[in-house]
Amino acid sequence: MTTPIPTPYEDLLRDVLANGSHKSDRTGTGTRSVFGRQLRFDLADGFPLITTKRVHFKSIAYELLWFLRGDSNVGWLRENGVSIWDEWADERGELGPVYGVQWRSWPSPDGTHIDQIQQVVDTLRRDPDSRRIIVSAWNVADIPDMALAPCHAFFQFYVADGKLSCQLYQRSADMFLGVPFNIASYALLTLMVAQQVGLEPGEFVWTGGDVHIYDNHIEQVNEQLSRNPFPAPALRFARRPESVFDYRYEDFVLEGYRHHPAIRAAVAV
């Protein structure tokens, strides 16, 4: 008997369709929404890139590298053919103190800045049992200056039995467009950090707050749910860079990504 392919993401889409409340939202689009859901992905079972539609891995990888640069301008993304942040950028390409700035340069009261990512790597090497291996993008003082408040706001690393796991808290979860990117992005980051600190990959745990499907995505979601999934692809590294900040797109080797065609949908801005 063939073992069914797990479909936690697609199962959550069905949950939102069946149980979601109708809510208004900042964009004026309207959503079906549930509150407080969790998905778990064992990274030993493959790389969690959704197969029931094509997900653009290049954009995911370059966005993560852009975060790790501590960048707040879309110029570097555009140079590499990635346009996913263009809708929020100003005429100079600026977004304000968004994810990368908070990850790499969190402002301290004394005028210095904290590199949260470097702290994560250092703590994993020095004290892997710490319960404080955390990165936050939710800087309350800076939110008014951000083009978009952080949706994926807070993540924590955890080490047990020689394996590195990561849990993300996503306060606002656009299930059709955003969440497939977020799952793959943080799974990739977990694999990168695990390689850097000499641990095996464990789980990626995704926790969502306001988990929603936009009203203008319902048709696309139903089309996606009519498709049978393929087995998860694999992700390996072409080399081991000197640090977590030295990875290049060419270092990520995605193998065996079978997928259904892409499904187009409008972004709620």
Swiss-Prot record:
Instruction: Describe which pathway this protein belongs to, using the record's wording.
Output: Pyrimidine metabolism; dTTP biosynthesis
Query: What are the protein's GO molecular function terms?
Result: thymidylate synthase activity
**Where, per UniProt, does this protein localize?**
Cytoplasm
Reported EC number(s) for this entry are: 2.1.1.45
The question of whether Transferase is a record keyword is answered with yes
What keyword terms does UniProt attach to this protein? Cytoplasm, Methyltransferase, Nucleotide biosynthesis, Transferase
Q: Name one Pfam family in it.
A: Thymidylat_synt
One GO CC term of this entry? cytosol
Highest taxon listed in the record's lineage: Bacteria
Q: Where does dUMP bind?
A: 26, 131-132, 171-174, 182, 212-214
Q: Function, please?
A: Catalyzes the reductive methylation of 2'-deoxyuridine-5'-monophosphate (dUMP) to 2'-deoxythymidine-5'-monophosphate (dTMP) while utilizing 5,10-methylenetetrahydrofolate (mTHF) as the methyl donor and reductant in the reaction, yielding dihydrofolate (DHF) as a by-product. This enzymatic reaction provides an intracellular de novo source of dTMP, an essential precursor for DNA biosynthesis.
Tell me its family: Belongs to the thymidylate synthase family. Bacterial-type ThyA subfamily.
Protein's recorded name: Thymidylate synthase
Q: Which organism is it from?
A: Leifsonia xyli subsp. xyli (strain CTCB07)
